Amino acid sequence: MTENPYASPESPLYGGGTQAPAPKAPGLMEQIVGVFTEPTALFQKLRQAPSWVPAVVLFCVLAVAVTLVWGLKVDVDAMLRPMLERNPSVSAGQIDMIIDMQKKFILPFGLMGAVFFPWIGVLLMAFLYWLVGKGMAEGEAPSYTQSLSAASVPALVGLPHGLLIILMALLRPVGGLTPEKLPPTSVGFFLPAENPKLVAALFALDLFSLATWALSFLAFRHLLKLKPAGAVLATFLLVLFQAGFKILFAK
């Protein structure tokens, strides 16, 4: 028997049928659990329903906590004087003046950076991923919102690193160490070096940084659907911005 050609306006033929509900974006707790347990499945869900703001808000909260705990204990003189003394164009009097100024402003400016830099970093990296996706996606190019998810959610695997920094700053003298040098999670913690660029390279080889880069590669493949070469390029850009420039400009 043929179907009734006189379908009612409520029929799907007229667009009035029941439509499937839009996919629901994974919540923040689901994202945190997912990056440690089922990252591929998480990124596939985020492709259908991107989410990024809760992750960045959490990064800001953690960055503020790290800055407060570290900034109240750090010895600014011990942190800056060796670097300034290596610069022959800076006199002893100028060194003292710079250190005195930094002691006053390191905490307020650090807190401002903790609030704004996570947003700026995610927006910038997402734009670069979006550009890569325009030319190196396997099918449809990713949206900017999907790129924002890829730029933020994989970094949730680094949350324990921030908590370790806070714990180490509370339990031991900080001296002139910067936050990333406090927890025993990098090669630089176990292999001391004198050359500033080598020091930066060794501390860049951190367990949580490596995990973030690996998860980001998965996000590029499963969330943005980039070709393998595109995922490699996007991962290279991430490593360049997170580690390469630090090594290049280390003094």
List each language-model region with its residue ranges.
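Low-complexity, intrinsically disordered extramembrane tails and loops of integral membrane proteins
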Residues: 1-26
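Short, flexible segments with low predicted structural confidence
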Residues: 17, 103-104, 191-192
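Short juxtamembrane and helix-loop transition motifs at transmembrane-helix boundaries
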Residues: 21-23, 110, 193-199
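Residue-level detector of alpha-helix boundaries and kinks
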Residues: 24-25, 117, 205
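Selected alpha-helical membrane-embedding segments in polytopic membrane proteins
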Residues: 28, 36-160
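Hydrophobic alpha-helical transmembrane segments and adjacent short intramembrane/lumenal linkers
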Residues: 141, 145-251
